[in-house]
Swiss-Prot record:
GO terms for cellular component: BLOC-1 complex; cytosol; lysosomal membrane; mitochondrial intermembrane space; mitochondrial matrix. This is Biogenesis of lysosome-related organelles complex 1 subunit 1. The gene is bloc1s1. It is found in: Mitochondrion intermembrane space; Mitochondrion matrix; Cytoplasm, Cytosol; Lysosome membrane. Component of the BLOC-1 complex, a complex that is required for normal biogenesis of lysosome-related organelles (LRO). May also participate in the coupling of lysosomes to microtubule plus-end-directed kinesin motor. May also play a role in intracellular vesicle trafficking. May negatively regulate aerobic respiration through mitochondrial protein lysine-acetylation. The lineage of its organism: Eukaryota, Amoebozoa, Evosea, Eumycetozoa, Dictyostelia. Its main location: mitochondrion.
Length: 135
């Protein structure tokens, strides 16, 4: 009887071990499925992040190229406007110079006319004066 109890106990223990082993294998297999699912989920997120990072890098390079292009264009515009401004200043200088020359020419003309009138004989002066008054 005792030996039968021991034998039954051992048989029961062996069945429990086998059941535990089967359950352990099932748990490991299901953990593998869960782990693979988690890894796929994480990898999908990582792949999406990686793709977004590549897009950002491409956009950053494009932005940098456009910034350099616009910076160059801006510098060209600044140079062009500076040249235009200098040309306007030169035109203003020429205008002032021409007005000064014109004023000097009027002064010289007035002086020559004055000298001409004063150097003529006194007889011609009365004839000249009425002409000046008409002007």
């Amino acid at each position: 009887m005792l030996s039968k109890l021991v034998k039954d106990h051992q048989t029961h223990q062996n069945k429990l071990k086998e059941e535990n082993e089967v359950l352990k294998k099932e748990a490991i297999a299901s953990m593998g499925v869960v782990t693979n699912g988690l890894i796929d989920s994480v990898n999908t997120g990582v792949a999406c992040i990686f793709a977004n990072q590549k897009k950002l890098e491409t956009e950053a390079r494009l932005l940098q190229a456009n910034t350099a292009k616009f910076s160059k264009q801006t510098n060209q515009w600044i140079h062009l406007i500076e040249n235009f401004n200098n040309s306007l200043k030169e035109i203003g200088d020429v205008e002032n110079w021409s007005k000064k020359i014109e004023s000097d020419m009027h002064n010289i003309s007035d002086i020559i006319e004055f000298l001409y009138i004063n150097s003529n004989p006194i007889q011609q002066q009365p004839q000249q004066q009425p002409q000046q008054q008409q002007q």
